[in-house]
């Protein structure tokens, strides 16, 4: 995430907005691909995968 060109002179709300759009688009892509994968797997396996994914993302964001 550090390689994203966000200038430190930009206002805080603008940086938050850009980061929010990036994170939400990444999550959207992840859930879209997970949905297509879920068709071929059992729902229980899919739900376990989803919770692990979101836990990893939350831990990563909390460590900033």
Curated annotation (Swiss-Prot):
User: Which subcellular locations apply to this protein?
Assistant: Host endoplasmic reticulum membrane
Give TM regions. Answer: 13-30
**Primary location class:** host cell
Topological domains on the Cytoplasmic side lie at 1-12
Which domain of life does this protein belong to? Viruses
* Alphabetically ordered keywords of this record: Host endoplasmic reticulum, Host membrane, Membrane, Signal-anchor, Transmembrane, Transmembrane helix, Transport, Viral movement protein
Give the record's membrane topology: Single-pass type II membrane protein
Record carries keyword Transmembrane: yes
Q: Which residues lie on this side of the membrane: Lumenal?
A: 31-64
Give an example GO biological process.
transport of virus in host, cell to cell
This protein's GO CC annotations? host cell endoplasmic reticulum membrane; membrane
Signal peptide (residue range): none
**Where are the coiled-coil regions?**
none
Protein family: Belongs to the gammacarmovirus double gene block protein 2 family.
What does the UniProt record say this protein does?
Answer: Required for cell-to-cell movement of virions in the host plant together with p7a.
Protein name as it appears in the record: p7b
Please give the organism.
Maize chlorotic mottle virus (isolate United States/Kansas/1987) (MCMV)
